[in-house]
From Swiss-Prot:
One of its GO terms (biological process) is queuosine biosynthetic process. The gene is queC. Keywords: ATP-binding, Ligase, Metal-binding, Nucleotide-binding, Queuosine biosynthesis, Zinc. It comes from the Bacteria. Its EC number is 6.3.4.20. Catalyzes the ATP-dependent conversion of 7-carboxy-7-deazaguanine (CDG) to 7-cyano-7-deazaguanine (preQ(0)). Its cofactor is Zn(2+). This is 7-cyano-7-deazaguanine synthase.
């Protein structure tokens, strides 16, 4: 009897993590979700994730309170008093960067995977369109994977399906699974908490919209580019 393949998806209810979840549901026998409540500015994403998780068929969906991150990490995403800016800070990072967020999220997802006996943790981080976040880079992910495997004496792979895709190719991936409309209309990527097309002005909305326009205008080429990356 073959082993049941299990994965834990770090799931925020946004475009990237929803696309990763949909792909995982087509690739694994059991898919579990983990969502984090850290007092984020766009807190509506938690309910969006809960609703989408139920609709798409997660085997289990754990929503964790990690509000201590909000106390420690000062960012436009953790403080309503700080306006989201399209300009970089003096340190070269966006003011939406939450220090340690993916370190914490991947650690907790790794622990959850350990308890479930899952061999994969899936996250939608991306180095191509990473918005300047250092904890979305491939080197960081590989280092985290090594640390978790050594610390728990168990092999668990951190899978990053979007790592080398641009935003247009991420839209193409959703379309490949016949889920472009769902991702476009029902996910929450906007830093100002507006579902679907969002506010249209925050960095997350601008990146999402430019990718969708690129895909809509160059569908065949983007699909071809996606296919070449997926088969490397």
């Amino acid at each position: 009897m073959s082993k049941v393949s299990k994965a834990v998806v770090v799931f925020s209810g946004g475009q990237d993590s929803t696309t990763c979840l949909i792909q995982a549901l087509n690739q694994y026998d059991e898919v579990h979700g983990i969502t984090f409540d850290y007092g984020q500015r766009h807190s509506q994403e938690i309910e969006v994730a809960r609703s989408l998780g139920q609709r798409l068929g997660l085997v289990s969906h754990k929503i964790l309170d990690v509000s201590m991150l909000n106390e420690l990490a000062i960012s436009a995403l953790t403080r309503d008093s700080i306006e989201v800016s399209n300009e970089l800070m003096e340190n070269g990072l966006p003011n939406t960067f939450v220090p340690g967020r993916n370190i914490l999220f991947l650690t907790l997802a790794g622990i959850y995977a350990y308890q479930l006996g899952a061999d994969s943790v899936i996250t939608g981080v991306c180095e191509t369109d990473f918005s300047g976040y250092p904890d979305c880079r491939n080197d960081f992910v590989k280092t985290m994977e090594s640390a978790l495997n050594q610390g728990m004496d168990r092999q668990c792979k951190i899978v990053t399906p979007l790592m080398w895709l641009n935003k247009a190719e991420t839209w193409a991936l959703a379309d490949q699974y016949k889920s472009l409309e769902l991702v476009r209309d029902e996910t929450l990527t906007c830093y100002n908490g507006i579902i679907g097309n969002g506010c249209g002005t925050c960095p997350a909305c601008l990146l999402r919209q430019s990718g969708l326009e690129d895909y809509s205008n160059n569908r065949e080429q983007v699909q071809s580019d996606l296919a070449s990356k997926c088969h490397k």
